[in-house]
Amino acid sequence: MRAIGVFEYITLRAVLACATALLIGLVAGPRVIRRLTEMKIGQAVRAYGPESHLVKTGTPTMGGALILIAIAISTLLWADWINRFVWVVLLVTFGFGWIGWMDDYRKVVYRDPEGMPARQKFFWQATIGLVAAVYLAFAVSAPANTELWPLFKAWVGSGFTMPLPTRADLIVPFFKSVSYPLGVLGFVALTWAVIVGTSNAVNLTDGLDGLAIMPTVMVGSALGIFAYVVGRVDYSKYLLFPYIPGAAELMVLCAAIGGAGLAFLWFNAYPAQVFMGDVGALALGGALGTIAVIVRQEIVLFIMGGVFVVETLSVMVQVTWFKYTKRKYGQGRRIFRMAPLHHHFEVGGWKETQVVVRFWIITMMLVLVGLSTLKLR
C-alpha cells in the first residue's frame, strides 16, 4: 500500500509523465515520420521565404500530432482525472490543435502554402479563446467546481459589477504584494489575449529546425514549477503568491509537454526529419497561454517567452511599416531584411543552427529571470 501511496506525490507523477511522453515520442516518432512520408504530407515552402529553405520542400509536416498524442496519453496516465484545470488545458490545446490540423491539411492537400484563410483561422482561435477565458474567470476564482455557478449568478445579480477574489488579480513580478484587480471583463479580455496571442506567437516562431520546440519546453517546464507553488498552501503562502486550489496538478501536464517536446526535438533538430506544423505550434502556444493564466503569471510568461514576443512584434512592425510607407510613398519599405526576426538574421548571414541555438540561449536566460521572480520580490 505504501508503494501505491507514493503516486500521490505530484512531483513523482510529473517525472513519470515526462518520461512516458518522452518514450512515446521516441518510439512512435520513426513510424509517424515514415507514415507521413508515405502519405506525401510534405511541407510547402513559401516562395518569398529564404532561398536556403527551398531544400526543405517535401519534408514531412503535421508532426505536431505526435506531440499532442504523447501529451494526452502521458497526462491521462499520471494526472488526476477530476482536476478541472488539467481538462481545460487539454481542451484548449486540442482545440487549437484542430485549427492547426485544418490549416496544415489545406496546405498539404491543396498545395497552398498560406493554408486556411487568416480570418477563418482567427475566428476559431478567438472563439476557443473566449470560451476558455470566460470559464477561467470563474474557475480560478472559485475553490471548487461546485462554487462556479453560484459565483457566476452572483456576478450577474450584481449587475456585472461584482469584483473577483484577489487570487484572480494580475500579479506584478518583482514587487511584493503588488497586484491589480481585473474584474470579470478585464480578466476575460486579458486571458483571451494571452491564449490567442501566445498560440500565434509560437506559430510564428516555428520557422527553423528546432527553433520553437525548445523554448516551448523550457517555458512550459518553468510554468510547471509556478503551478506547483501556487497549488500548494504552504509554498504559496511563504512565497506570497495567491493559492489556486488544484493548480499544482498542472505540473504533471507541463512535464508531459516537456517530455513530448524533447522527443520531438530528436527528430526536428537540424536537418529536420519532420516539422510540427500548425497542429503542433498553435496547440502548444495555446497550452502555454492557458497554463500561465491559471497560475496567474501572465507577465512572467511575457518575460520567459521573450523570443516568442519579439518574433511576433517583428512581424507586426514589418507589416505595419510596409503598409504605411507604401501608402505614403507609393512603395513599401522594410525595417527588417525579412520577418519574422529569425529570417532577418538568416538573410544577414547567420547559419540556421546559429540562429536556433542563440535563441535557445536567450530563452534559457529569460526563463531564469522568470524563475527568479519566485523569490526576488
Curated annotation (Swiss-Prot):
Pathway involvement of the protein, from the record: Cell wall biogenesis; peptidoglycan biosynthesis
Catalytic activity: UDP-N-acetyl-alpha-D-muramoyl-L-alanyl-gamma-D-glutamyl-meso-2,6-diaminopimeloyl-D-alanyl-D-alanine + di-trans,octa-cis-undecaprenyl phosphate = di-trans,octa-cis-undecaprenyl diphospho-N-acetyl-alpha-D-muramoyl-L-alanyl-D-glutamyl-meso-2,6-diaminopimeloyl-D-alanyl-D-alanine + UMP
Known EC number: 2.7.8.13
Example of a GO cellular component annotation carried by this entry: plasma membrane
Coiled coil: none
GO biological process, one term: cell wall organization
Keywords: Cell cycle, Cell division, Cell inner membrane, Cell membrane, Cell shape, Cell wall biogenesis/degradation, Magnesium, Membrane, Metal-binding, Peptidoglycan synthesis, Transferase, Transmembrane, Transmembrane helix
Purpose of the protein: Catalyzes the initial step of the lipid cycle reactions in the biosynthesis of the cell wall peptidoglycan: transfers peptidoglycan precursor phospho-MurNAc-pentapeptide from UDP-MurNAc-pentapeptide onto the lipid carrier undecaprenyl phosphate, yielding undecaprenyl-pyrophosphoryl-MurNAc-pentapeptide, known as lipid I.
Protein name: Phospho-N-acetylmuramoyl-pentapeptide-transferase
